[in-house]
Swiss-Prot record:
Name assigned to this protein: Phosphoglucosamine mutase
Cofactor(s) needed: Mg(2+)
Listed NCBIfam families: glmM
Enzyme class: isomerase
Keyword annotations: Isomerase, Magnesium, Metal-binding, Phosphoprotein
């Protein structure tokens, strides 16, 4: 991670950390870096979610892009993966999404996509950061005829919706409940599933600029769980603020998380011979029950660090077409370059329709082990060295020996905060509590600062 760019673009509290001034510079410098080798007038797509700060930051960002001669196609409110899809399919130089994903409304973010539809690599981000930190802005300042042109492009959203519908199957009146998190999916999810023939109940579809992710969406699926049971829906589908995640709810009101969604889609593709190298890419946070289910089905797995960017890197490097995270990021590389909650939802309902199985039946093939995660505040310098502390190494090894292969322990530093994360999985909650509490007691005694 750089000075400005985190694991998913530039984020911060809108108007305090992520200011219009910074957004202007990101537009100007980011646009230049991503289009400097273009032979024709560069074109950049810009989208945003429903946050009240979105239009403010969009105006500043667009001004920066126009100032270096870039033509800007303004997409309005739509999902992050829609920007990636449109960049790749319509030959744009780049795309920019203004969103802080599942964060509360006071935050916002700016993330870039290259002309291939993928998020930027570290080298491109470093180029932009170098320009941000330069003492003087020496980029070209074209005169009137060289300035960029601003184009409103609402057709982009319709094209994305049509594309997702084309990947699905008719749902013939299937009862579907949607929670669009008062976010980006509020402009598209209803239309997509109506076009597929679903009978819909929708919540989280009245954004006011301040209620994005507020007690709704993939991080707060409780309301959707109740709606599914009350409406008799076959499935509930909860997206986050920018609709790059999906958490599902089965007909009984039970949560189906990213691990189970990946398993269901992966098994379906594997049985059709369409799972590349018969492998799913996942992260170290995926549940042990997910791993055991894959082993039972003979499906391989590749494991990365936490973060969808690392999943995508591994998929691109090795040619895999399915990967994701427990949190609901699912990347279907045959269809899009990034996690796409609405695409995952369309595929999940297609599998239900084609197999004739309920979501609870499909999800029951994965037995999720109880999991507990505790964050311990430590000095930043110590979080990377924790595993070198003898007492910590010894207690982890002791707990792993006691598990005898029927559980899992993960101790890792936070990528963004002065925290050490201690996670354990085991067959019962009592065992999980024992393993985590025993390890955290030692960690706190040795290096904790609480």
């Amino acid at each position: 991670m750089g000075k400005y760019f985190g694991t998913d673009g530039v984020r911060g509290e809108a108007n305090l950390e992520l200011t219009p001034e910074l957004a202007f510079k990101l537009g100007r410098f980011g646009g230049y870096v991503l289009s400097q080798h273009e032979t024709e007038a560069p074109k950049v797509f810009v989208g945003r979610d429903t946050r009240i700060s979105g239009e403010m930051l969009e105006s500043a960002l667009v001004a920066g892009l126009l100032s270096v001669g870039i033509h800007v196609y303004k997409l309005g409110v739509l999902a992050t993966p829609a920007v990636a899809y449109l960049v790749e399919t319509e030959g744009a130089s780049a795309g920019v999404m203004i969103s802080a994903s599942h964060n509360p409304a006071l935050d916002n973010g700016i993330k870039f996509f290259g002309g291939d539809g993928f998020k930027l690599d570290d080298e491109k981000e470093a180029e932009i950061e170098a320009l941000l930190d330069a003492e003087e802005d020496t980029l070209p300042r074209p005169s009137a005829e060289g300035l960029g042109i601003l184009v409103d492009y609402p057709e982009g959203l319709r094209k994305y919706e049509g594309y997702l519908v084309s990947t699905g199957t008719p749902l013939d009146g299937m009862k579907v409940a949607l929670d669009t998190a008062n976010g980006a999916a509020s402009t598209s999810a209803r239309q997509i599933f109506a076009d597929l023939g679903a009978q819909l109940t929708v919540i989280g579809e009245t954004p006011d600029g301040l209620n994005i992710n507020l007690n709704v969406g993939s991080t707060h699926p409780e309301a959707l769980q109740e709606v599914v049971k009350e409406s008799g829906s076959a499935i509930g589908l909860a997206f986050d603020g920018d609709s790059d995640r999906l958490i599902a709810v089965d007909e009984n009101g039970d949560i189906v998380d990213g691990d189970k969604i990946m398993y269901i889609i992966g098994k379906y593709l594997s049985e059709k011979g369409q799972l590349a190298q018969n492998t799913i890419v996942t992260t170290v946070m995926s549940n042990l029950g997910f791993h055991k289910a894959l082993n039972r089905e003979g499906i391989n797995k590749a494991v990365t660090a936490v973060g969808d960017r690392y999943v995508v890197e591994e998929m691109r490097k090795s040619g895999y077409n399915l990967g994701g995270e427990q949190s609901g990021h699912v990347i279907l590389m045959d269809y899009n370059t990034t996690g796409d909650g609405q695409l995952s939802a369309v595929q999940l309902t297609k599998i239900m329709k084609e197999t004739g199985k309920s979501l609870s039946e499909l999800a029951a093939e994965v037995t999720i082990y109880p999991q507990k995660l505790v964050n311990i505040r430590v000095e930043n310098v110590m979080k990377e060295k924790a595993m070198e502390v003898p007492a910590i190494k010894v207690i982890i090894e002791k707990m792993e020996e006691e598990m005898a292969g029927n559980g899992r322990i993960l101790v890792r530093p936070s990528g963004t905060e002065p925290l050490l994360r201690v996670m354990a999985e085991a067959p019962t909650t009592e065992e999980v509590d024992y393993y985590v509490d025993t390890i955290t007691d030692v960690v706190r005694a040795e290096i904790g600062i609480d």
